[in-house]
Amino acid sequence: RRAGEINGEHVPEIILLNSHDGTSSYQMLPGYFRFVCQNGCVCGQSLGEVRVPHRGNVVEKVIEGAYEVVGVFDRIEEKRDAMQSLILPPPARQALAQAALTYRYGDEHRPVTTADILTPRRREDYGKDLWSAYQTIQENMLKGGISGRSARGKRIHTRAIHSIDTDIKLNRALWVMAETLLESMR
C-alpha cells in the first residue's frame, strides 16, 4: 500500500500468493482493501497479474512484478469510480446477485436468495450503485452467516469461505461480473 493512502476508506493492494511446494510460482494480483468491512477484493485478470517462477533471481523478479502491479492501481481506482457512478436498476442488481449465486452454488439447491445476498451489513453499503451492490454481494458470499434453508427445508446459516483458492476464485469471478455489467450498461 502506498504511504498516505492508508487513512482512506479503501486502498489498492498487491495480493501475493505462493505455491508452497515450490513447483509453481509466486502470483501477484491487483486488489483493493476496504477498511470498513476488512474486505479484500481481488480485481479480475483484465487488470493484469504477474507470475514469478520459483527459479532464477526470484527476489528481483518479485520486486519487478510488484512495480508492475502497482502500475495498474490507477486503473483500479478508475473502475471503482465508474462502478460508484453507475446507478443500478433493481433488475440489474438482481441479475448480478443471481449470477453470483449461480457461480457459488451451480444448479444445486441455493440456501439463500438474491434478496438475502443483496442485504447490506452496514449503512455504507446502502447505495444503489454498482459498487455498493458488488461490495454487499462479495461480503455476504465470503463471510457467510446468512440465514437460509437447506435442501431439506432445515434452517441453516451459510458458511464463510476460508479456503484461499476458493476466496480468490470467487473474488475474481465477482469482479468480472461487476466489470461486465459496468461495460454493458455504459
Spans of features found by a protein language model:
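Intrinsically disordered, low-complexity regions enriched in serine/threonine
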Residues: 3-186
